[in-house]
Amino acid sequence: MAVFDTPEEAFGVLRPVCVQLTKTQTVENVEHLQTQLQAISDTALQELQQYILFPLRFALKTPGPKRERLVQSVVECLTFVLSSTCVREQELLQELFSELSACLYSPSSQKPAALSEELKLAVIQGLSTLMHSAYRDIILTFYEPSILPRLGFAVSLLLGLAEQEKSKQIKIAALQCLQVLLLQCDCQDHPRPLDELEQQQLGDLLASFLPGISTALTRIITGDFKQGHSIVVSSLKVFYKTVGFIMADEQLTRIPKAQAKPVVEHRVAALMIHREADWVKSTGDKLAIFIKKIIDCVSVHPHWKVRLELVEFVEILLLKCTQSLVESTGPLLKVLVGLVNDESPEVQARCSTVLRRLADQKVVVGSRALADILSESLHSLATSLPRLMNTQDDQGKFSTLSLLLGYLKLLGPKVHVILNSVAHVQRLSRALIQVLELEVTDVKMVEERRWNSDNLSASAEVSAARPWSRVQRRYFRCFTDERVFLLLRKICQLLGYYGDLYLLVDHFMELYHTSVVYRKQAAMILNELVVGAAGLDVEDIHNKCPSMGPEELREIVKSILEEYTSQENWYLITCFEAEEGEEVMMKQQGFQAVTSGVHTCQVVSFPALSKPSPTICSMNSNIWQICIQLEGIGQFAYALGKDFRLLLMSALYPILEKAGDPTLLISQVATSTMVDICHACGYNSVQHLINQNSDYLVNGISLNLRHLALHPHAPKVLEAMLRNADASLLPLVADVVQDVLATLDQFYDKRAASFVSVLHALLAALAHWFPDSGSTGQLQQRSLEEEGRQLPAAGEASTTAEDIEQFVLSYLQEKDVAEGNVSDLEAEEEVQSAPPKVDENDTLPDVEPPLPTHIQIAKDVMERCIHLSADKNLKIRLKVLDVLGLCVEVLQTHKNQLLPLAHRAWPSLVHRLTSDDPLAVLRAFKVLQTLGSRCGDFLRSRFCKDVLPKLTSSLITQAPISARAGPVYSHTLAFKLQLAVLQGLGPLCENLDLGEGDLNKVADACVIYLSTKQPVKLQEAARSVFLHLMRVDPDSTWLLLHELYCPVQQFTAPHPSLHPVQLQGATQPQNPYATNVCHLLLQLQ
């Protein structure tokens, strides 16, 4: 469409349209005009502005009822014209303002007209566009006293729409239009900024509307949350911009005491406000009520954008109205301080920025500095804090502690001065100690034991997470919300950062010593104080550098560390199962859990576990105290960084003691603490940490083993070291191992459990450090031999006499071994092998070469285990059997040492297998499997004579029971024993290369379990037995399976000269063995 740039061309196009609209006011004529206007340039429209507006205004002013659609079209067309032009005449601006405002009012009913939402929205947008189109100085002349009635009329209409309208779009548009009418909008279309005089005149004018605006907006803001966050945000913005402008201290200081009389009608003059001192005080008091209502409601609003706008609300009022709104300063500061720890990062960041700005500008409220008000507020809060922590719910505690944290952040370095007051420190510490009281009645903590040593080993690589943030989850008596605990940690860190650390540490150390009731809480606080003093992860809005040097901090940490690891605070009784010697030692030394009788741990009967008792509570308390102290050591390392290496000699040994503690929680926390130390001190892993400090650790263990009655935890340290070190540690610990074995020989009746755990850790480490490199080759060789057995015997004709001779000699040797003639084994090997040729100058050694260190250790340990395998304590027997299995794994490459020891261990092992507790039978059977895979020929005759008959008899006896049993049977010990035997028999038959008779016994015992009446897991285990039997004797296995179930009635011979084969097996598909037999036969093919 062509664009008409000149007024003449535009007039020629628009004249007939305007004339037609003036004559006939219809929607079509208005839309026709708007269509033509889109083809006119802005310059031409500006020249023809009043000509174009005339028919539109005429249509609005025509008396009589009008269709809403027509009025809406006229307002939209008028808005289009105003958006493209400027209003340059004051009279035109006032008239258009009145005409648009009248569209929203019904003169007949004397209240806002009941219009469609579309028309209301169009009129609101038209008013906003009109005010933006006013030309420069014209807008200022509009705001004169004579306009007060019309302006007040528009303001009341817009407030009514914002409060009562249901449409969210209209509500927001009305609030934005109100902001424009008050000259407080944020857009760039407004004229130049107002000078001081203009601001004062406009403030005097708008002050008349302040009561109505503040009242209506407060109702909107504190309304239902369901109205939507955007409405609350817009209402807050209008409120603080209006109040911040009218009540601005900068304006009010220039207001003269006497009011100049305006040249206006008496009716209008009565509406004028003189903002003198009394009015300011009265209005400030009334606004304080509204502001408190708004703060109480909005500070807990669920939407973060509303809380973010509240921060802007507080900032504007605190920066502009500190003198006029003195009564509101406290609540405003309180909400700002509370929101500094908001869950929304956007709110937190903005709040911190505002706090920093307030601190930098040194805002004065009334005649007092902001810091004085904050100090007074902190004092008041500290006074009521113990009561609030005792009476509030979790949300209340969170809000109160957020407030406390905010005060500390805002006061910053001045906290140091405040904490010089003994009363302040006592109130704060009493509240913190009270709220941090732990719940220690949980029986589960005492029951959770570290039954095996696997929990001792930490991960090889150090986690990348911040160490001190991984605090063990704990439960408190006063709250359950985890956010409250996080706030308490931040508060303690800020106290350590800004306060006098010497004073605070002395105070909480005194509480630590005063009573066992305070000890755990005081330790938690001390840990966080040290982290805060280091300035790590502390949000400092004052940019204060830590005043404490690393040497001073290290000395403080050293003193706390010494207190934590002292005898009376480190060696607390945490379980019922304290060994006798340790218990006696504790009583002799006086190292009870606490000095008072409440937490003295006594050995009680197990029925006491049925309900929480004071004894259980005391042990739980001890567990938590040790865990908190361990976490504290990790936090100290985090605070000191690599400087903590200077304290490792006094810290690492006690931590390793707790890493081997039988209480699961303590063991886990100790291991986690070692990971924290690795973070701080630059070690790659816990293994690296222990290797680098192993010399003094081993020295300490060696010394303490010689005085075991005074140092009963020395074996635990060695156990933890072995779990977390590598083979480079072996030369250092070789002598210590001999000390352990010698001490075990001396105290086996009292301390066998501790030492057997150490031996288990030692052998597990040796098996890991020195794996059998030849095992893979042996497996490959075995598979090749199996393939060779399955090949056709085509090459057997070429067998030589030498081969036959070698076969006979090997057979005789294996027969001797199977019959137990072990002592002659070495002599036979010397006879059969020709002596090597040596040089005449060389001399033959008179003695055998020394064994490798790990082989000698394994040999010595296995000798002790043979004696301990008959111990009366079941737990010790189980652990000894585990150690025996590990010894066999380590010694498998040295048969000359392994076989004699296996010979000596065999009688005890048979007794465990046949006449012991079912748990011991299970464990002994695992040892038997290990022996079978490492020394098969040696074990063959013994196994067949001493063990196999009882195993097969047991399987046959239990088969009917398991076939009839229900699903609960799979949880019984009898089932687990059946399953273990079935799973292990197959490999044993193959490894021991049993003869046909013994294989038949195994097959007869296991064939019952191929029935589908047996539990599924037992069927699977039985199938695994027959899969192994197929490898040893496939023909017999094939025949046995077909006797159970025959898929075909008659086998056709592969050659005509052979007769067909008829088997006796059942052929019915309902046969209970059919499924498993078919599965096995398929595998055999």
UniProtKB/Swiss-Prot annotation:
Biological process (GO) annotations held by this record are:
positive regulation of DNA damage checkpoint; regulation of TOR signaling
Q: Name one Pfam family in it.
A: TTI1
Q: Where is this region: Disordered?
A: 777-799, 822-847
Which keywords label this protein? Cytoplasm, Phosphoprotein, Ubl conjugation
| A GO term from the CC aspect | TTT Hsp90 cochaperone complex
Q: Which locations, inside or outside the cell, does it occupy? A: Cytoplasm
At what positions is Phosphoserine found? 459, 823
Q: Which domain of life is it from?
A: Eukaryota
The UniProt PTM text for this protein says: Phosphorylated at Ser-823 by CK2 following growth factor deprivation, leading to its subsequent ubiquitination by the SCF(FBXO9) complex. Phosphorylation by CK2 only takes place when TELO2 is bound to mTORC1, not mTORC2; leading to selective ubiquitination of mTORC1-associated protein. Ubiquitinated by the SCF(FBXO9) complex following phosphorylation by CK2 in response to growth factor deprivation, leading to its degradation by the proteasome. Only mTORC1-associated protein is ubiquitinated and degraded, leading to selective inactivation of mTORC1 to restrain cell growth and protein translation, while mTORC2 is activated due to the relief of feedback inhibition by mTORC1.
Q: Which InterPro entries match?
A: ARM-like, ARM-type_fold, TELO2-interacting_protein_1, Tti1, TTI1_rpt
Subunit record text: Component of the TTT complex composed of TELO2, TTI1 and TTI2. Interacts with ATM, ATR, MTOR, PRKDC, SMG1, TELO2, TRRAP and TTI2. Component of the mTORC1 and mTORC2 complexes. Interacts with WAC; WAC positively regulates MTOR activity by promoting the assembly of the TTT complex and the RUVBL complex composed of RUVBL1 and RUVBL2 into the TTT-RUVBL complex which leads to the dimerization of the mTORC1 complex and its subsequent activation.
Q: What does this protein do?
A: Regulator of the DNA damage response (DDR). Part of the TTT complex that is required to stabilize protein levels of the phosphatidylinositol 3-kinase-related protein kinase (PIKK) family proteins. The TTT complex is involved in the cellular resistance to DNA damage stresses, like ionizing radiation (IR), ultraviolet (UV) and mitomycin C (MMC). Together with the TTT complex and HSP90 may participate in the proper folding of newly synthesized PIKKs.
Family recorded in the similarity comment: Belongs to the tti1 family.
Q: What is this protein called?
A: TELO2-interacting protein 1 homolog
UniProt source species: Mus musculus
